Amino acid sequence: TTVAEGVELAKAVVAASAEVPADVKLIIAPPFTHLYPVAEVVKGTAVGLSSQNCADHVKGAYTGEVAVDMIAGVGCQYVILGHSERREYYGETSATLVEKVKLALAAGLSPIFCIGEKLEEREAGRHFEVVTEQVKNVLFTLTAEEMAKVVVAYEPVWAIGTGKTATAEQAQE
């Protein structure tokens, strides 16, 4: 999307947010290049703003990386971590994710921690094991106070871009 398209989408989400129950939090996560203009749109509204990732370093010469203080500084309250695409294509490990989660929390951001299994893991009956390991390896390193600031997002990897969707029962498992 272009920045203009991102801004228009943010305006539409803000307008629609009036119809959302008070106990539901709407959060949008545009690309990094759209964060500032979208932050201006959602500022002062009930709509939260998230980055799609963060660096695993606070400062330093890491060309192309975006540190948590930069993300918080632009107005984000959240950061998506552990997305299946980051795990698969960028080799993000549990150790990397522990570091990112802790950096995000230290910067005042709430991590949106993604968990989910691949199709072959579900078909082999290993989905509980896989998701449990993802949670245990990263989130069990946190204190109860830190954990209270984390949003866990279940996203079955086998449903991404395949046209297949998880049933309500599968999501509730």
Report each predicted region and the residues it spans.
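Active-site loop-to-helix "anion-binding N-cap" substructures in soluble metabolic enzymes
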Residues: 1-173
